[in-house]
Every structure is written in C-alpha cells, then in structure tokens.
C-alpha cells in the first residue's frame, strides 16, 4: 500500500511539473507568435 502511495504521488508531481513547465513555455513574452489569452 505504501508503494502505491509513493507511485501515485510521483505521478501527480510529474504531471504538475509538466503543467507548470507548459504554462511557462506558453508565456506570450517568450512566444510572440501565440495569442495572449
């Protein structure tokens, strides 16, 4: 059960990191070609 918890927390942290990285990458200041929502 402990291993399952660690696995779930690792996956959640991984997806949160991807979301934050994608949000920063979509910054209009870095990508002038994209529209600013």
Curated annotation (Swiss-Prot):
**Recorded topology in the membrane:** Single-pass membrane protein
Which superkingdom does the taxonomy of this entry point to? Eukaryota
SUPFAM superfamilies (UniProt xref): Photosystem II reaction center protein I, PsbI
Listed under GO biological process in this entry are: photosynthesis
- Is Transmembrane helix one of the keywords? yes
**Pfam families noted in UniProt:** PsbI (PF02532)
Q: Which InterPro entries match?
A: PSII_PsbI, PSII_PsbI_sf
The record's function comment reads: One of the components of the core complex of photosystem II (PSII), required for its stability and/or assembly. PSII is a light-driven water:plastoquinone oxidoreductase that uses light energy to abstract electrons from H(2)O, generating O(2) and a proton gradient subsequently used for ATP formation. It consists of a core antenna complex that captures photons, and an electron transfer chain that converts photonic excitation into a charge separation.
Q: Family per UniProt?
A: Belongs to the PsbI family.
Q: What NCBIfam families does its record include?
A: PRK02655.1
Describe its assembly. Answer: PSII is composed of 1 copy each of membrane proteins PsbA, PsbB, PsbC, PsbD, PsbE, PsbF, PsbH, PsbI, PsbJ, PsbK, PsbL, PsbM, PsbT, PsbX, PsbY, PsbZ, Psb30/Ycf12, at least 3 peripheral proteins of the oxygen-evolving complex and a large number of cofactors. It forms dimeric complexes.
HAMAP family this protein is in? PSII_PsbI
Recorded protein name is Photosystem II reaction center protein I
Q: Which organism is it from?
A: Nephroselmis olivacea
């Amino acid at each position: 059960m402990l291993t399952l918890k660690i696995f779930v927390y690792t996956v959640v942290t991984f997806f949160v990191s991807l979301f934050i990285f994608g949000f920063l990458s979509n910054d209009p200041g870095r990508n002038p070609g994209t529209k600013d929502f």
